Amino acid sequence: MSFSDWINSSYPNPGIDGQWRWLHITVLIFCIGLIVAFALIFRKRSLKTRKIVLWCLVGTILFFEITRRIINLVKMNGGGNFNDYLYTLLPRPWCAIACWSIIIATVFNKKFLYNFASMTALLCALVFFAYPGAGFNNQYILFENLYSISTHSLLLVTSISLITLKFTRFEYKNIWKEGICLAVILAYVFLEIYGLKIESDPMYFMPGNDVMDIFGVGYSTYLAIYIIFVIIYFNVFYLIDDRKNVVARFKHKNNLDNDEESRKSYEIIKNVLNSKLI
């Protein structure tokens, strides 16, 4: 195998069942080790130090994203139409979109962007490591395999590190900002599918996708499960991080309900007494 074969991923690479084998498990353990190490070492360090750690992670993601695009452009050798270039240059699947969400969040340094990026990147990473459809499933680790394994590993480490290193703050009062981010991503995804026609199912909600086949259910049932899961998944972050306000609101509502019940009881007793006096 030459370097050209490796970098262009052109060397014959038979498929294997690599899920939950030694490489898959080793990479996952390594990622968990990095997450724990970053949290223990850098959590209480200065913001400047924590940003250096973040930029190192994001810089590595950016390196893989740019390198892959350069390689694919070189392979095109000036051929192809406009759509082929869009297919090569734009982030298409959800995982690639998550990579660029993290990059954009770090560049603009906004809390709500960190929030959204960490949630969506973590989901992509968890799905990949639970059921990897690429990367581990070939005999050789060519560049495309390395890209897939590395970017998903970086998504896992970076998404959790954004939380442990205190770049995120999930509050229900600001959830509308993350909601706008999700709406923008959905609009981009529909543009990919129906407008640009460069990806058939970036977020795995269209009929006939691999995840639906795993569940073995009809599309209507799958879509309902998908929507419910996404709602619950995103709310978990707020229920944990904003739990004090959630509990306070719950107690306040209970107090209001109790006050209302007391007022109604008082009115009933008052009316009964008045009727007896009359």
Segments the model singles out, each with a brief description of its role:
Residues 244-277:
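Short, highly charged, low-complexity non-transmembrane loops/tails of multi-pass membrane proteins
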Residues 24-43, 58-67, 183-190, 227-239:
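Hydrophobic core of alpha-helical transmembrane segments in multi-pass integral membrane proteins
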